[in-house]
Amino acid sequence: MAGEKFQKKGKEKWKEKVWYTVEAPPYLGSKEVSVALGEDSNSMVNRVVEVPISELTGNFKKSNEKALFRITNCEGTKCKTIFIGHYIGDDYIRRLVRRRKERIDIIEDVKTSDNSIITVKIVVVTDGKVTNTKKFQIRKVLTDFILNKGLSLPYSEFVRYLIGDDIYNDMISATKDIYPLKKIEVRKSELVSLSGISEIHAGSQNSGEEPVVQN
């Protein structure tokens, strides 16, 4: 009897929930990226949604990359989001770094023209051993490049650039006089603050519901 009551109560609670659609922000096309069950709109706010970047850009070479969106508010059953970061799968990164290759990591807090701050993590893989001088030069050029690019764009445009196709060729071009790099990736980004809204942690979770909704 107790088991039957528990099952009945669970079914009734499930029936009380509503299906919500989750949209990418306008600067990424306002596409529907996921659907999720919630008790009400308040239960949806602050959930984090993970979406393949290939679905946003149409570039299926980016199938290893995931974008993260946080739900900020709901209008009816439509949930609005902001981009809070992205990442490339660890397995893909490990495949890049093989024997007789060197890895150079660059991590910078990038400030955009509208005073948002996003941490950008770049990984560079060389085809062979490089001198410490070359490593220093590569780090400096790419650091200057990404910081200056951030200052030239508002957050919305910088996000599109960050997950788009042009950034790879631009980084290759920026370093071509130092070393003929072939493998550079922005392996991860994390929003720190959005135009005055401080301390946005990509990993924080809404305690009342499932924290990550996967498409």
From Swiss-Prot:
Claim: Ribosomal protein is one of the keywords in the record: yes
Top-rank taxon: Archaea
InterPro entries, sorted: Ribosomal_eS1, Ribosomal_eS1_arc
Pfam family name, one: Ribosomal_S3Ae
Keyword Ribosomal protein: yes
MF term (GO), any: structural constituent of ribosome
Protein's name according to its UniProt entry: Small ribosomal subunit protein eS1
Organism in which the protein naturally occurs: Thermoplasma volcanium (strain ATCC 51530 / DSM 4299 / JCM 9571 / NBRC 15438 / GSS1)
